[in-house]
Amino acid sequence: MSALGRNLGNFIQTFSNKTSSIKTVNGLKRGLLPCCGSTVRPIAKDNHHQSPVLNVNRSSISGIRTELFNSNGLITQFQVRQYCSESKLQVSPTPKTLLSEICQREITDFKTIFEDNNNEVDSFLEEFGFELTKEGDQALLKKTFADGTNIVIRFETLEQPIEEDFDEQDENDQNERDEDDAEEQEEDEVEEEEEEQQEEEEGENDEELTEGAEEDSHEHPFEIEVTPKGNASGKLTFGCYASHDGNYTVSGFYKGGFGETVNPVDIGGTSMEFQDNILLVLQQYGINERLSFFIHDYVHNKKINDYVESFEALKDFVSKE
């Protein structure tokens, strides 16, 4: 029998049994353009940064599964699609129409779920008298105090992405699935021993948990440049971190302004008396919990606004005829 006859026979057999010999192609999402024969599928990416696409070997693709040929013969959701006879591309509903609707849903979700903290940002500027300026992807807060001291606070306006190792995560998941009953029993015994140790060393464990929570919190770095009145050569720069809960950390300082190459003093290696007093001095110049909240809210608001504006721009593009 010829190849054409065998293929035709297989098609008739599978169609009569309400099954399909068509295989699934990894990477096609939501069934958009199901007949375009795309050989591109996305790979894992972190945060909102775009990652390069991965080309799929066409020899491994025999077709695209659709809901028209599901094995149970039932169609839960079906939308009539029309295709251009010449290009074989979907024309109704068009991909642009579907994408426009998806963009609008994303815009609505961002505006509904995430709070608008612009009022808190404006309130801080009015109360503490800082002047806000922008230089590229950095924001600057400037103020001259009554004693003539000039303070400049600088921080990045782009939120730093949290790096994720997807390959390592997949490997860990596979290892967990491969664990046998003996290993699970051993883990249970270890957990029982740990519980006993936790009861005996409750205070020490609480301290470790607190330190772990501080390390997991997403902090925003910022710098403070202090210029004494009439002494430009006596500039000092402090390195700090602002947390989402209002806490902040002063990690070090050095003589000089922004960008100067100087070995900083690690405040963590100084005495508690020094650390307490340096915090009190900086509080006199507006370095406090309100500033920490301001930096976090400002970066967070910019991130949400950037997302919304990007979706709106894409929606406007696909909405044009």
Swiss-Prot record:
Pfam families: MAM33 (PF02330). One of its GO terms (cellular component) is mitochondrial matrix. The keyword Coiled coil applies. Gene3D superfamilies: Mitochondrial glycoprotein. Residues 161-214 have a biased composition (Acidic residues). GO terms for biological process: cytosolic ribosome assembly. It comes from the Eukaryota. Disulfide bonds: none annotated. The keyword Coiled coil applies. Residues 167-212 form a coiled coil. Keywords: Coiled coil. Residues 157-220 are annotated as: Disordered. This is Putative uncharacterized protein DDB_G0288137. It comes from Dictyostelium discoideum (Social amoeba).
